[in-house]
Amino acid sequence: MGLSDGEWQLVLNAWGKVEADIPGHGQEVLIRLFKGHPETLEKFDKFKHLKSEDEMKASEDLKKHGATVLTALGNILKKKGNHEAELKPLAQSHATKHKISVQFLEFISEAIIQVIQSKHPGDFGGDAQAAMGKALELFRNDMAAKYKELGFQG
């Protein structure tokens, strides 16, 4: 399920828009994730106390974590599928320490696409959305394979 060179170019063009404001995009992705799937908030001891969107928007820690998440994902996307070195430590921590299920990775993938679409509608049309969806699916599938190697049934 690889992506063509053209699809990777669409993904990386869209990601360039994200990188122009990683903290802002990351914060919005996490807020959208937590609002759409409140059960995901329980995985974040640091953010469990944030009950309203206003509290989430005011949290510098949430903004920082959003930036961390999107920076790591950006480093993976830039490898165009050749992301073994970047993926291994991420899968290790998410399987053994954080216990983040593949389903939660699907939820955050949806949030990422929704945020890019809402912030950059003119630059993130149907083809770019489909390409990003494929890239994030590749990421999730590879995370799931690593989880399996680690004995995590997430």
Curated annotation (Swiss-Prot):
It is found in: Cytoplasm, Sarcoplasm. GO terms for biological process: removal of superoxide radicals. InterPro entries: Globin (IPR000971), Globin-like_sf (IPR009050), Myoglobin (IPR002335). PROSITE patterns: GLOBIN. GO terms for molecular function: heme binding; metal ion binding; nitrite reductase activity; oxygen binding; oxygen carrier activity; peroxidase activity. GO terms for cellular component: extracellular exosome; sarcoplasm. Its EC number is 1.7.-.-, 1.11.1.-. CDD domains: Mb (cd08926). O2 binds at H65. Nitrite binds at H65. Signal peptide: none annotated. Residues 2-148 form the Globin domain. It catalyses: Fe(III)-heme b-[protein] + nitric oxide + H2O = Fe(II)-heme b-[protein] + nitrite + 2 H(+); H2O2 + AH2 = A + 2 H2O. The modification Phosphoserine is found at S4. Keywords: Cytoplasm, Heme, Iron, Metal-binding, Muscle protein, Oxidoreductase, Oxygen transport, Phosphoprotein, Transport. The keyword Transport applies. The modification Phosphothreonine is found at T68. Heme b binds at H94. Monomeric heme protein which primary function is to store oxygen and facilitate its diffusion within muscle tissues. Reversibly binds oxygen through a pentacoordinated heme iron and enables its timely and efficient release as needed during periods of heightened demand. Depending on the oxidative conditions of tissues and cells, and in addition to its ability to bind oxygen, it also has a nitrite reductase activity whereby it regulates the production of bioactive nitric oxide. Monomeric. This is Myoglobin. It comes from Didelphis virginiana. The gene is MB.
